[in-house]
UniProtKB/Swiss-Prot annotation:
Cofactors: K(+)
Domain CBS: 167-225
Annotated EC: 1.1.1.205
Catalytic activity: IMP + NAD(+) + H2O = XMP + NADH + H(+)
Protein name in the entry: Inosine-5'-monophosphate dehydrogenase 1
Keywords: Acetylation, CBS domain, Cytoplasm, GMP biosynthesis, Metal-binding, NAD, Oxidoreductase, Potassium, Purine biosynthesis
InterPro entries in the cross-refs: Aldolase_TIM, CBS_dom_sf, IMP_DH, IMP_DH/GMP_Rdtase_CS, IMP_DH_GMPRt
Pathway: Purine metabolism; XMP biosynthesis via de novo pathway; XMP from IMP: step 1/1
Entry function: Catalyzes the conversion of inosine 5'-phosphate (IMP) to xanthosine 5'-phosphate (XMP), the first committed and rate-limiting step in the de novo synthesis of guanine nucleotides, and therefore plays an important role in the regulation of cell growth.
Residues where IMP binds: S320, D355, G356, G357, G378, S379, Y402, R403, G404, M405, G406, Q430
Length: 503
């Protein structure tokens, strides 16, 4: 052994019987002979779904719906639409995501007809509140709108009325433009119509609403790379399904609207139910990639690989809103889980999604270098403009709800299937409901994050994911476990106060 060797190879570090998280380990720097711009983050979600960046949005009902899926695809990643809703609703979300050629999530509020506007907070930073049947943009018809100036002129008695009683109608075709309109033409139409917003329609259904302010905001975002586009020329979108008999009907509807990959969504994927569903999907839809999980051991992974999965999802109890390890006493530290599962998956060429535990760009670097092909993000993307739900204000902070799919609130709505639950029996929570701060748009957040990831790869001497995996397997990349003091030293410390900005 050379006296110049530092640290440990990964196989030795992860064989010591400890369950490591991302913060527990640190990579040692290697040799740099290329620029940051030379780093390629291109990868695969599954066997036949290529991505330009290794980013996947989690199938959670407070993270991934149409705007998130379209935005992730436009950046070169992909979104996985949750299934905590009816079959028709999930299919509608996928259809809308594929129709969002311009993935612009408006800053304007969207309310249901019976809503009462009690303060200007309902408008957020926008001049509009739009009225839609369910209070979201996932159903096909916009009913009307209210402007901030209009509401300010109303007296107190009028403000107690339902929004439907005083909104302005959007029925006029003057507001509508085709969904496939070019961005430059869209900007011109907004200026020409002098109405402040336009409604994008496809086959008579509302796809999106875009305001002048939205256009100006998006123009200030970093330019994105090649998007994730499918053979049909539209954004590639993934979807989560369960393993029950009813999910076979759900899958049929999703295939009909063009879903590009399906994730079998289970907190413990090594089950007879998932093995049977994998075989059903591969037999019925052989051209559709199916991703199995969640798993954290090589044994679990091997079972799903032998059943025919095209990708694996790794993580159990590592998410910020997940309490599985606490409640059920099962799981694994995410760094250890990713390394172990990737070791067996690499032998079969199966891409691995590292799901959970991602709080910063450093965690993404660690997950990818340890063998993952992509990272799945929940809390990292929750609170963004594209995440479902409206903003609220708490102690002067702009926040959005974020809940675990194992929380009682989500399980009551239907996600108990993910935890192999039965709606007629007791429900045991494996997650919590919380809130996260406003993060702005993922169209800005992700490009800056990916640049930070590239810098991490450069420091490690890896110009691509494939290069990083090769350096790790050949024991050239070295790691060390971090003591508690080392973790403190590696963060901001010794200051009375500070302001931390990522970009």
């Amino acid at each position: 052994m050379s006296t110049l060797e530092d640290g440990f190879p990964a196989d030795k570090l992860f064989a010591q019987g400890y369950s490591y998280t991302y913060d527990d380990v640190i990579f040692l720097p290697h040799f740099i002979d290329f620029s940051t711009d030379a780093v390629s983050l291109s990868t695969r979600l599954s066997r036949r779904v290529p991505l330009s960046i290794p980013c996947v949005s989690s199938p959670m009902d407070t993270v991934s719906e149409s705007h998130m899926a379209a935005a992730m695809a436009s950046l070169g990643g992909i979104g996985i639409v949750h299934y905590n809703c009816g079959i028709a609703a999930q299919a509608s979300i996928i259809r809308q995501a594929k129709s969002l050629k311009h993935p612009i999530a408006s800053d304007a509020g969207v309310k249901f007809p019976e809503y009462e506007i009690t303060s200007l907070d309902a408008f957020g930073p926008s001049s509009f509140v739009f009225v839609e049947q369910t209070g979201t943009m996932t159903t096909p018809k916009l009913l009307g709108y209210v402007t901030k100036s209009q509401w300010k002129r109303m007296n107190y008695e009028q403000r107690e009325m339902k929004i439907y009683d005083y909104m302005k109608s959007c029925d006029s075709s003057d507001y509508c433009v085709p969904w496939e309109i070019d961005f430059e033409k869209l900007e011109f139409v907004l200026e020409d119509k002098q109405k402040g917003f336009v409604v994008l329609e496809r086959d008579g259904e509302t796809v999106n609403v875009v305001t002048k302010d939205d256009i100006q905001r998006v123009k200030g975002y970093p330019k994105s790379g090649p998007g994730t586009v499918g053979p049909d020329g539209e954004w590639m979108v993934g979807a989560a399904i369960g393993t029950r008999e009813s999910d076979k009907e759900r899958l049929e509807h999703l295939v009909n609207v063009g879903v590009n990959a399906v994730v079998l969504d289970s907190s413990q994927g090594n089950s007879i139910y998932q093995l049977e569903m994998i075989k059903y999907v591969k037999k019925t839809y052989p051209e559709l990639d199916v991703i199995g999980g969640n798993v954290v051991t090589m044994y679990q992974a091997q079972n799903l690989i032998q059943a025919g999965v095209d990708g694996l999802r790794v993580g159990m109890g590592s998410g910020s809103i997940c309490t599985t390890q606490e409640v059920c006493a099962v799981g694994r530290g995410q760094a250890t889980a990713v390394y172990k599962v990737c070791s067996i998956a690499a032998q079969s060429g199966i891409p691995v999604i590292a799901d959970g535990g991602i709080s910063n760009s450093g965690h993404i670097v660690k997950a990818l270098v340890l063998g993952a092909s992509t990272v799945m993000m929940g809390s990292f993307l929750a609170g963004s403009t594209e995440a479902p739900g409206g903003y609220e204000y708490t102690n002067g902070k702009r926040i959005k709800k974020y809940r675990g799919m194992g929380s009682l609130e989500a399980m009551t709505k239907g996600s108990d299937q993910r935890y192999l639950g039965d709606q007629t029996k007791l429900k045991i929570a494996q997650g919590v409901v919380g809130a996260v701060a406003d993060k702005g748009s993922v169209l800005k957040l992700i490009p800056y994050t990916m640049h930070a990831v590239k810098q991490g790869f450069q420091d490690l001497g890896a110009s691509s994911l494939q290069s990083a995996h090769g350096l790790l397997r050949s024991n050239i990349l070295r790691l060390e476990a971090r003591t508690g003091a080392a973790q403190v030293e590696g963060g901001v410390h010794g200051l009375v106060s500070y302001e931390k900005k990522s970009f």
